[in-house]
């Protein structure tokens, strides 16, 4: 199987929006970390601060419903998750 060194994916955060309002952004960041760890069999997942800020850009209780991320391999079972920025 081909190694996933640089991978782009869309993570759906609608399940987070159905929960209670307080602490939604924190739960959303934990959910992103859990999804990436599950898909890539990672021991450590590093979240870019720009991604965390874009998830909660409308406040801590109003998270976005979907987020497009780029997952890059940094080391042995260590992955960096960044916000995917479209280039025109």
From Swiss-Prot:
Q: Which keywords accompany this UniProt record?
A: Ribonucleoprotein, Ribosomal protein
A GO biological process held by the record? translation
Q: Does the keyword Repeat apply?
A: no
Q: List the disulfide bonds.
A: none
Q: Name one Pfam family in it.
A: Ribosomal_L31e
GO CC terms for this protein?
Answer: ribonucleoprotein complex; ribosome
The answer to whether keyword Ribonucleoprotein applies is yes
User: Which SMART domains does this one have?
Assistant: Ribosomal_L31e
Q: Which NCBIfam families match?
A: PRK01192.1-1 (NF002258)
Family affiliation: Belongs to the eukaryotic ribosomal protein eL31 family.
**Protein name in the entry:** Large ribosomal subunit protein eL31
Lineage of the organism = Archaea, Thermoproteota, Thermoprotei, Sulfolobales, Sulfolobaceae
